[in-house]
């Protein structure tokens, strides 16, 4: 533990006398300290600056070019307050265009930062908005169509912390970087010379880009020393394509207190916590026993994601309790969730997620050729059979029965298996259509609830489906009632071979030029067409 960290703890906890407790055992030097992003707050005139730039980072002793917001890698934690307007100047110092999307924020389309909110290379974009939503852990990342996966892989991601009066009154752990700790989890693949090795090709367009190295806040298997008592972890799955399943190595429980859009009604006790790409959960864990343990991710049954070293529980970070104790608590109740309104007479939108069968077949072949049988480890046999037959399926894989034909582009469908030129950049679909930035698929009405029915039937891939401009409630997830910790405010829902239904409402405008997006948050699916724009 570095001296400055030690002083930070001593000052924060008022324990100058803790110095003699510095033992070699407690602060084993072999693990890097968990990097803690700086808090970025608005200045006296309610402004803040974000600079998108290239830098250098070191992984396993090798230097790599990385991208970050206000630094070499990742970014600060942007602190916002409910009801308080903020102006953000975003300077793009990269040699290519980017955008900055406020993931999870309920703000107008013009400031949402989707693929239309281009910040040119060397240019600046200024956005002003007022968060009117409840306290939540959200995030920022790029959203340049066709390049989102690469720009995120290069390191662009940062947390957004929305605060409000309600959460301040709860006695939750709230000492930033001490007992209130951000945990941004990402996998990376590196080339032999240590550079981030990103490709968008047929294999990654099918299963996503995944790596064999896990980073936590940009460090490999770091350690965090925290005071005994309740430790609050703000978990973000910042991976391009890998779903996670978070647990404690000694099986101690995690108490989920918040999902994407804020507090749950009451804590939910779990021993493992699946985390889809783009999702956030806040958990409290009791470390008052003083025993060190690892936060780990358990193997998942997702195509290609149980390849070593992820075929076994894999450490995310080490948690080392200190001898001093912090004062945060786990409340019995957290907030009041509004009752779900009647679903009678609501506009229903049917969205069907699918992949060109040729991409499915060729992607699987490349995956098997590269990784052999372990590419399929953890997959159940039904999924595997569906994939293996995928290449011969042609139109059979498309389930026309459940489709909302109004959104279908039958021309594009007709080309699919009739000698149409295959282009993997346009091989993932919603309602049979590839994303078109200039053609929003529909117009939602402001302030009105809608029921969205999102189907992955006939496609066994995992699709974490994310909707911009809203925090919704899950009515059913992949054909089942949502788990208790997924009944709160969400912006991402699991679609995996089944049907999920969500209740959405949009309280801000999104004109055609700055439409909201709805898309798969497996970034390579998004970049190759599985996205739609809609207006409000």
UniProtKB/Swiss-Prot annotation:
> Which residues bind Cu cation 3 per the record?
143, 468, 519
Q: Which protein is depicted?
A: Multicopper oxidase CueO
The EC number of this protein is 1.16.3.4
Q: Supply the gene name.
A: cueO
Q: What induces the gene encoding this protein?
A: By CueR, at increased levels of cytoplasmic cuprous ions.
Q: How does it assemble?
A: Monomer.
Question: Which residues does Cu cation 4 bind?
Answer: 463, 520, 525
Under PROSITE patterns, the record lists:
MULTICOPPER_OXIDASE2, TAT
Cellular component per GO, a single term: outer membrane-bounded periplasmic space
Q: Where is the signal peptide?
A: 1-28
Pfam families linked:
Cu-oxidase_2 (PF07731), Cu-oxidase_3 (PF07732)
What's this chain's function? Multicopper oxidase involved in copper homeostasis and copper tolerance under both aerobic and anaerobic conditions. Is responsible for the oxidation of Cu(+) to the less harmful Cu(2+) in the periplasm, thereby preventing Cu(+) from entering the cytoplasm.
Family, per the entry?
Belongs to the multicopper oxidase family.
Instruction: Paste the cofactor note.
Output: Binds 4 Cu cations per monomer.
Q: How is it modified after translation?
A: Predicted to be exported by the Tat system. The position of the signal peptide cleavage has not been experimentally proven.
**Residue ranges of the Plastocyanin-like domain?**
53-165, 229-295, 424-536
Q: What happens when the gene is disrupted?
A: Mutant is very sensitive to copper after copper shock. Causes a moderate defect in aerobic growth on CuSO(4), strongly impairs survival during anaerobic growth on CuSO(4).
């Amino acid at each position: 533990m570095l001296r400055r960290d030690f002083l930070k703890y001593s000052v924060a906890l008022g324990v100058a006398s803790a110095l003699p407790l510095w033992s070699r055992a407690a602060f084993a030097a072999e693990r890097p300290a968990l990097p803690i992003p700086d808090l970025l707050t608005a200045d006296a005139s309610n402004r803040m600056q974000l600079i998108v730039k290239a830098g250098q980072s070191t992984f396993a002793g090798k230097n790599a070019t990385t991208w970050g917001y206000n630094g070499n890698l990742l970014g600060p934690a942007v602190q916002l307050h409910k009801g308080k307007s903020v102006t953000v100047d975003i300077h793009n110092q990269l040699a290519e265009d980017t955008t900055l999307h406020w993931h999870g924020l309920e703000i107008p389309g013009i400031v949402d930062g989707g693929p239309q909110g281009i910040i040119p290379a060397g240019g600046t974009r200024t956005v002003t908005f007022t968060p009117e939503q409840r306290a939540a852990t959200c995030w920022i990342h790029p959203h340049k169509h066709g390049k989102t996966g690469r720009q995120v892989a290069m390191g662009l991601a940062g947390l957004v912390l929305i605060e409000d009066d309600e959460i301040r009154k709860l006695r939750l752990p709230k000492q930033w970087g001490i007992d209130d700790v951000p945990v941004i989890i990402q996998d990376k693949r590196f080339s032999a010379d240590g550079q981030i090795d990103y490709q968008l090709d047929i294999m990654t367009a099918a299963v996503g880009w995944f790596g064999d190295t896990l980073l936590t806040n940009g460090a490999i298997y770091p350690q965090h020393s925290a005071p005994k008592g309740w430790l609050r972890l703000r978990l973000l799955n910042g991976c391009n394509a890998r779903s996670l399943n978070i647990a404690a190595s000694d099986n101690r429980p995690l108490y989920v207190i918040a999902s994407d859009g804020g507090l749950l009604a009451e804590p939910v006790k779990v021993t493992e916590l699946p985390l889809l790409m783009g999702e956030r959960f806040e958990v409290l864990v009791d470390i008052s026993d003083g025993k060190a343990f690892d936060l780990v991710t358990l193997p998942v049954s997702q195509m290609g994601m149980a390849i070593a070293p992820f075929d076994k529980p894999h450490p995310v970070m080490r948690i080392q309790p200190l001898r001093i104790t912090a004062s945060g608590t786990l409340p019995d109740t957290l907030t009041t969730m509004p009752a779900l309104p009647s679903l009678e007479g609501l506009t229903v939108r049917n969205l069907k997620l699918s992949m060109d069968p040729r991409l499915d077949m060729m992607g699987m072949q490349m995956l098997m050729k590269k990784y052999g049988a372990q590419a399929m480890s953890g997959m159940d046999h039904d999924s595997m059979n569906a994939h293996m037959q995928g290449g011969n399926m042609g139109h059979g894989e498309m389930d026309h029965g459940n489709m909302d034909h109004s959104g279908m582009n039958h021309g594009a469908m007709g080309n699919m298996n009739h000698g149409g030129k295959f282009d993997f950049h346009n091989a993932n679909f919603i309602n049979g259509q590839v994303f078109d930035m200039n053609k929003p698929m529909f117009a939602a009405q402001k302030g009105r609830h809608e029921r969205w029915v999102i189907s992955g039937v006939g496609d066994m891939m995992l699709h974490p489906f994310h909707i911009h401009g809203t925090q919704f409630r899950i009515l059913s997830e992949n054909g089942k009632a949502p788990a208790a910790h997924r009944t709160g405010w969400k912006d991402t829902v699991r679609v995996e071979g089944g049907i999920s239904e969500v209740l959405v409402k949009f309280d801000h405008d999104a004109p055609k030029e700055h439409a909201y997006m709805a898309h798969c948050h497996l970034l390579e699916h998004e970049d190759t067409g599985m996205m739609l724009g809609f207006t409000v």
